[in-house]
Amino acid sequence: MAVMPDKWIREKAENSRMIEPFVNHKSSKGVVSFGLSSYGYDARVDNKFKVFTNVNSAIVDPKNFSENSFIDKETDVCIIPPNSFVLASTVEYFRIPRNVLVICVGKSTYARCGIIVNVTPLEPGWEGHVTLEFSNTTPLPAKIYANEGACQFVFLSGESECEKSYDDMKGKYMNQHGITLPLVK
């Protein structure tokens, strides 16, 4: 597998709509950086968040997920309570080619503040907004800035197309829009 460079990412975004909307340069002045980088793409976090709360004494169960586990916030700055967790999604919509696997890594700016972002791989043939999981590992409240960089996606090109893509397998998170909660089918 090869890590794909900026030129390839740009071509796929502009000609195959792999990333929409696509920022063709790195934006970093006064913001957490986002946009095209040398060997990846720094995606932005949308302004809708699901902040976990214990107000309703809900139990987090991935097989029976309760919407009472969180409160919805639409804001330019999301405050993550100490040692807590927030769901969000990317501003960008991704369409992953059949011969590409995408992995996500966190932003150094957030990691240095104890904020960790987790995203599972984007499978070949998958498309949608990416649901982002932010953890505040500190004993203090922490901020996430909407419409600024959240994480970096690295595109790995396989030697050939896969036999069965995420789309072929009718993956449960296919074509997701906004924040998608856990699904066990």
From Swiss-Prot:
Reactions listed under catalytic activity: dCTP + H2O + H(+) = dUTP + NH4(+)
CDD domains in the cross-refs: trimeric_dUTPase
Q: What class of enzyme is it?
A: hydrolase
Name the InterPro entries on file: dCTP_deaminase (IPR011962), dUTPase-like_sf (IPR036157), dUTPase_trimeric (IPR033704)
| GO BP, one annotated term | dUMP biosynthetic process
User: What pathway, per the record?
Assistant: Pyrimidine metabolism; dUMP biosynthesis; dUMP from dCTP (dUTP route): step 1/2
Superkingdom: Bacteria
Q: Which UniProt keywords apply?
A: Hydrolase, Nucleotide metabolism, Nucleotide-binding
Among its keywords, does the record have rRNA-binding?
no
The EC number(s) this enzyme carries: 3.5.4.13
Q: Which residues form the active site?
A: E133 (proton donor/acceptor)
- The reply to whether Iron-sulfur figures as a keyword in the UniProt entry is no
Instruction: Report residues binding dCTP.
Output: K107, S108, T109, Y110, A111, R112, T131, L132, E133, Q152, Y166, Q176
Molecular functions (GO terms): dCTP deaminase activity; nucleotide binding
SUPFAM superfamilies listed in its UniProt record: dUTPase-like (SSF51283)
What's one Pfam family here?
DCD
Protein family according to the UniProt entry: Belongs to the dCTP deaminase family.
Q: Which proteins does it associate with, and in what oligomeric form?
A: Homotrimer.
What does this chain do? Catalyzes the deamination of dCTP to dUTP.
Q: Enumerate the NCBIfam families for this protein.
A: dCTP_deam (TIGR02274)
Which named protein is this? dCTP deaminase
